[in-house]
């Protein structure tokens, strides 16, 4: 069968399979498919993966062809299900693979990247692999993987958070300045203590000088002292 025909059938199969569930009678195939999570290869089927929104999870598949004829891996997809009621929460985007031919008795590996972006909760991930064999496209489900998804913790030094903090700080400072200009100045003026004026002791000098000038009829400050003494002597005689 030509590869172009396989791809045509593969596209038609994806379009007609609702929720990536196979229709019609189930067939038994001797094809073993398993995977490991590259980021946490120690996790098994009985473990619970812990992922954060924004993570990228890489599934590395191993496909063993125990059939008597050659098979071809042409695509991969999957589902996140509710582990309690088994309802489908979301379908993964269908990805094209290869095509990768797998002769009888051999095995191949390939990767699938999954971007985690779900409401924080518990899920079961169930991948599906599309296999072309004998002019047919077969959808083979893989084992499920339980996972707990949470939102990523926001770091205090996150650039987006720092920018938000700066915006809030500038806004708060601006509001304080406007409030001071409108109400603050008037308030501080009204409550500020009034300073008492100090009486200068030098103020008596001009008064005394003026009194002397008025009594003599002229300003005596410029008259030599010897002349004044002579005048006083004459008055006594």
Swiss-Prot record:
Residues 20-161 are extracellular. Residues 1-19 form the signal peptide. InterPro entries: TRAP_alpha (IPR005595). Residues 198-219 are annotated as: Disordered. It is found in: Endoplasmic reticulum membrane. Pfam families: TRAP_alpha. Residues 183-237 are cytoplasmic. Keywords: Endoplasmic reticulum, Membrane, Signal, Transmembrane, Transmembrane helix. It is a single-pass type I membrane protein. The chain crosses the membrane at residues 162-182. The keyword GTP-binding does not apply. Residues 201-216 have a biased composition (Low complexity). It comes from the Eukaryota. One of its GO terms (cellular component) is endoplasmic reticulum membrane. Is probably involved in a pathway contributing to genomic integrity. Belongs to the IRC22 family. PANTHER family: TRANSLOCON-ASSOCIATED PROTEIN SUBUNIT ALPHA, TRANSLOCON-ASSOCIATED PROTEIN, ALPHA SUBUNIT. This is Increased recombination centers protein 22. It comes from Candida dubliniensis (strain CD36 / ATCC MYA-646 / CBS 7987 / NCPF 3949 / NRRL Y-17841). The gene is IRC22.
